[in-house]
UniProtKB/Swiss-Prot annotation:
Gene field: cobB2
Lineage top rank: taxon: Bacteria
Subcellular location(s) per record: Cytoplasm
Free-text cofactor note: Binds 1 zinc ion per subunit.
Entry's EC annotation: 2.3.1.286
Binding of substrate, residues: Y49, R52
Name of the top EC class for this enzyme: transferase
Protein name (record): NAD-dependent protein deacylase 2
Cofactor(s) named in the record: Zn(2+)
Pfam families, per the entry: SIR2
Naturally occurring in which organism (per UniProt): Mycobacterium avium (strain 104)
Domain Deacetylase sirtuin-type stretches: 1-231
């Protein structure tokens, strides 16, 4: 199972493209999600991610997340996600491999020590917020993969291993344009696995997928495990 922003959007987590919050609408995603953006204005980047952290904490997993967790009770299912929220975990999925990091993990930008201290309260979005400071003097940053950074080794290794051994790869809610994650479906197809795309929109994967289901995750995933054999035949 490879999930992307679409499944979280159903729970109320806006994507960069859909985020209409007035404070952030005028910024290019690169300014808020890159190593360069952090160097230029860490207060702005911290404010953006702190707001996202609290936004995600206030929403709930949807039927798509719950269906994936239920699949793990009946089949050997690996959950790989490009999302930085914890909705898969709150729905009951274990383990979940986060390719792009997590809004709920933090580390020092200088020494990389994990940060488990308190976070500033945020009742309303604020354009700039001062990040906490590590004991070494470095600023605390979200443990997110930004533009210009490599994917974390362990989640990526698990994702490749799961893809190489999979009979079926379900790709849900992803645009299929962000690499290297988008290459997992290509890897599965090259090894003879079936690739099932769940997305209400056509993507670059649609033409090569074994099966494309034009529904949202919450519409398609409940009951899909039982229907897959017939659909693929």
């Amino acid at each position: 199972m490879l999930s992307g922003a679409g499944i979280s959007a159903e729970s109320g987590v806006p994507t960069f493209r859909d985020d209409k919050n007035g404070l952030w609408a005028r910024f290019d995603p690169y300014e808020l999600s890159s190593t360069q953006g952090w160097r230029d204005n860490p207060q702005r980047v911290w404010g953006w991610y702190l707001w996202r952290h609290y936004l995600v904490a206030d929403v709930a997993p949807n039927a798509g997340h719950r269906a994936i967790a239920a699949w793990q009770d009946h089949a050997e299912v690996s959950v790989i996600t490009q999302n930085v929220d914890d909705l898969h975990e709150r729905a009951g999925s274990r383990p979940v491999h986060h390719l792009h990091g997590s809004l709920f993990e933090f580390r020092c930008a200088r020494c990389a020590k994990p940060y488990t201290g308190e976070l500033p309260a945020m009742a309303e979005p604020a354009l700039e917020v001062q990040p906490p400071v590590c004991g070494c003097g470095g600023l605390i940053r979200p443990d997110i993969v930004w533009f210009g950074e490599q994917l974390p080794d362990e989640p990526w290794r698990r994702a490749v291993e799961a893809t190489e051994s999979a009979d079926v790869v379900v790709v849900v809610g992803t645009s299929a344009i962000v690499y290297p994650a988008a290459g997992l479906a290509e890897l599965a197809l090259s090894r003879g696995a079936a690739v099932v795309e769940v997305n209400p929109e056509v993507t670059p994967l649609s033409a090569s997928a074994t099966l494309s289901i034009r529904e949202t995750a919450s519409q398609a995933l409940p009951g899909l495990l039982q229907r897959l054999p017939a659909l693929l035949n």
